[in-house]
Amino acid sequence: MGNNTSRRSQSQKFKNIPSISAGSFSTMPVQHRGRRRRSKSIVGRAAQNAVLRSKEKTWIVPLILLTLLVGWYFVNPNGYIKYGIFLSYPIPGTNPAQYGKGRLDIAFCLFYALFFTFCREFIMQEIIARIGRHFNIRAPAKLRRFEEQAYTCLYFTVMGSWGLYVMKQTPMWFFNTDAFWEEYPHFYHVGSFKAFYLIEAAYWIQQALVLILQLEKPRKDFKELVVHHIITLLLIGLSYYFHFTWIGLAVFITMDTSDIWLALSKCLNYVNTVIVYPIFVIFVFVWIYMRHYLNFKIMWAVWGTMRTINSFDLDWAAEQYKCWISRDVTLILLTALQLVNIYWLILILRIGYRAFTTNDTHDERSEDEDEEVSDEKSSAKKND
């Protein structure tokens, strides 16, 4: 009993680690069955049960929508649905296949935003939740947080690895920033590059919708999270338009790889294991190297070598956007993103200092979870 208490108090020191990802649809409050007025008809009860089921299993509605869209594609393979499922603008005669850019890419992003909504909810509720219960995470609020962070860790592990693979196929490996401009403008990309970029965009669109609809209880750093998501979406959209996708790939990798260790640290914290200490140290070093050192290197390339390597002028007809306007816009957004990351780094270092030097386990973000647990208990008592 004493060992469990000690281990719990040790790991709870890391509860305040900031979270970069938004919540999930499963964090929406589900109205208790007993509080609903029961319909007397069989059809009414069936409809009522279906609604309740869809709120408890929040992956059902996205799955139905995906099934309908894919089914419609098989009915009409040449319809607009194909632009959501497959990459658009293939360049004939290219090997490996190259793809251009255009407005139809928005359909691809929206379809996979819906796909991620299903995947996220299904994996969290049907797989990760069982893992959490195996590690004795019983409080519903903490279990939901564990599900979110475990899914985030899984997603960024896949995407971070994919991003590094894509970068390895280009001259900018490993963060050779001069390559940003040597072959600019980048009108076309191989399928793996374009798919990676648009799927990342789809993920952040889905995350933004969760925040906009406020499908989870806002945390203490909600405003910073909103600013982070706005900057991220602006960088994705403008980099795609300006043909700065090589810069975007580099930034994606720095963010994704650091988020792996961030989410892993939070997962281990919920599991209550001392392994969280070395993982947290690794996380801090990866965060500083990826989100600060490498991003400052990217920012320097935008400020400096962008002007000195190849032409530096605006030509709308040739879609040559490497000029002072795009430079300043990109630099402002990267600087804003860096300021948010510095703010989070300060929080992270403060948490680490308290965890390793004191017994102070107080943090503001944990109060959110405690309030959720308290609310759930109060609600349960009222329904009894």
Curated annotation (Swiss-Prot):
Q: Where in the cell is it found?
A: Endoplasmic reticulum membrane
Enumerate composition-biased segments (Polar residues): 19-29
- Cytoplasmic side residue ranges read 1-58, 125-154, 216-232, 291-328
Q: Which loops or segments lie on the Lumenal side of the membrane, by the record?
A: 80-103, 176-194, 254-269, 350-384
Q: Does the keyword Coiled coil apply?
A: no
Q: Where is the TLC domain?
A: 141-357
Transmembrane stretches, start-end: 59-79, 104-124, 155-175, 195-215, 233-253, 270-290, 329-349
Would you tell me the Gene Ontology cellular component terms?
A: endoplasmic reticulum; endoplasmic reticulum membrane
Q: Which key words are in the record? A: Endoplasmic reticulum, Glycoprotein, Lipid biosynthesis, Lipid metabolism, Meiosis, Membrane, Phosphoprotein, Transferase, Transmembrane, Transmembrane helix
Residue ranges, compositional bias (Basic and acidic residues) = 375-384
Q: Which enzyme type, at the first EC level?
A: transferase
- Kindly indicate whether the keyword Cell inner membrane belongs to this entry: no
Highest taxon in the source lineage: Eukaryota
EC annotation? 2.3.1.24
Substrates-to-products reaction catalysed:
a fatty acyl-CoA + sphing-4-enine = an N-acylsphing-4-enine + CoA + H(+)
| Residues recorded with modification Phosphoserine | S41, S366
Locate the Phosphothreonine modifications and list their residues.
T361
Q: Which GO terms describe its molecular function?
A: sphingosine N-acyltransferase activity
The UniProt annotation puts the region (Disordered) at: 19-42, 362-384
Q: Where is the signal peptide?
A: none
Q: Which InterPro entries does the UniProt entry name for this protein?
A: Lag1/Lac1-like (IPR016439), TLC-dom (IPR006634)
Question: Which processes are annotated in GO (biological process)?
Answer: ceramide biosynthetic process; meiotic cell cycle
Q: Which family does it belong to?
A: Belongs to the sphingosine N-acyltransferase family.
- Role: Component of the ceramide synthase complex required for C26-CoA-dependent ceramide synthesis. Facilitates ER-to-Golgi transport of GPI-anchored proteins. Has a role in meiosis.
The name this protein goes by in its record: Sphingosine N-acyltransferase lac1
* Organism, as annotated: Schizosaccharomyces pombe (strain 972 / ATCC 24843)
